[in-house]
Amino acid sequence: MSWQAYVDDHLMCEIDGNHLTAAAIVGHDGSVWAQSPNFPQYKPEEITGIMKDFDEPGSLAPTGLFLGGTKYMVIQGEPGVVIRGKKGTGGICVKKTGLSLILGIYDEPMTPGQCNMIVERLGDYLIEQGC
């Protein structure tokens, strides 16, 4: 299965009539493996900041998580495994695998729990596959 198919079929899937606003799979170096058409253009330093928080949990909390110039307030996650952020009625979930970052961005009516489930389920599967 191609990386794009993982985004199209597993991240942008419908759940209870809702779907993510945008999603992507990127390498730890920030290179895009696959993304939805409306995924925001991000800066390399934004991915560097996310990777740093996985290595040093809590490093993003004082400044927030930035992606595509949008600032998300960092909320509870799993240190070193999942980062979750909130902005208004939406937010972001980032799951780290051995080789990649799985990113999901949502807005109402999708709930944070639905976004987390979609992103983390694919991330867990890719970890099991050694990716």
UniProtKB/Swiss-Prot annotation:
It comes from the Eukaryota. Disulfide bonds: none annotated. Coiled coil: none annotated. Pfam families: Profilin. CDD domains: PROF (cd00148). Keywords: Actin-binding, Cytoplasm, Cytoskeleton. One of its GO terms (cellular component) is cell cortex. GO terms for molecular function: actin monomer binding. Belongs to the profilin family. Occurs in many kinds of cells as a complex with monomeric actin in a 1:1 ratio. PANTHER family: PROFILIN, PROFILIN LP04. This is Profilin LP04.
